[in-house]
Amino acid sequence: MADEHKHEESSPNLDPAVEVVERESLMEKLSEKIHHKGDSSSSSSSDDENEKKSSSSSPKSLKSKVYRLFGRERPVHKVLGGGKPADIFMWKDKKMSGGVFGGATVAWVLFELMEYHLLTLLCHVMIVALAVLFLWSNATMFIHKSPPKIPEVHIPEEPLLQLASGLRIEINRGISSLREIASGRDIKKFLSAIAGLWVLSILGGCYSFLTLAYIALVLLFTVPLFYDKYEDKVDSYGEKAMAELKKQYAVLDAKVFSKIPRGPLKDKKKD
């Protein structure tokens, strides 16, 4: 009986420790559940983000699959170089575009239709301008008015350097392209260059250089604007035309070009 009484007295002393252990185990279980929920929520959020990324990337991939004329991946404005020249050719600034196009048209009419010579025209313009300014400056002494303010004209250095740098890059690119064509590596480029030069020689025999330059300017002012407006229709027709050209080229390559012996540079490139 004494032992049982002792055991009953000692058992309540152990209850607080047991309660602490039970509380700690409960806290651990709760923390595990919270972590498990956090991981599941983070995984679900990451899954949602992945779904969003895939859904957002899907239209991009579809857009990249759309055929663009000449393999173009940038807008027409960027293809033209961007900045002021592209704005002029795309008629973004209508006053500037109209002024440039009108000035080119007047110059073409004067030199081609009226058969003016450039040096003669410049001399006549300078004679008229100097005579008007000289008479005006002397007439102000008699009519008691202020003389004309003739502005000082300075050609800035930076635009000329940029123009020269751009021309240098394009000339070097053209020379490297001609070198690659002449090396016999690509017969398609060779035939394209021959056909282009042949067409230019025919046009040069029919029209003067100034007329050809004016035609090129008219095309620059009209074709990009038309293409930007009807881009999808032009690209669809261009895709059909390119597919037909590839078929015809494949037939021509199988019958003719494949039988032509290739140069040593082509063999080295394959190795």
Curated annotation (Swiss-Prot):
Residues 1-60 are annotated as: Disordered. GO terms for cellular component: cytoplasmic side of endoplasmic reticulum membrane; endoplasmic reticulum; endoplasmic reticulum membrane; endoplasmic reticulum tubular network; Golgi apparatus; plasma membrane. It is a multi-pass membrane protein. One of its GO terms (biological process) is response to bacterium. The chain crosses the membrane at residues 95-115, 116-136, 206-226. Disulfide bonds: none annotated. GO terms for molecular function: mRNA binding. Residues 1-10, 20-39 have a biased composition (Basic and acidic residues). The modification N-acetylalanine is found at A2. The keyword Cell inner membrane does not apply. Interacts with VirB2. Plays a role in the Agrobacterium-mediated plant transformation via its interaction with VirB2, the major component of the T-pilus. This is Reticulon-like protein B2. It comes from Arabidopsis thaliana (Mouse-ear cress).
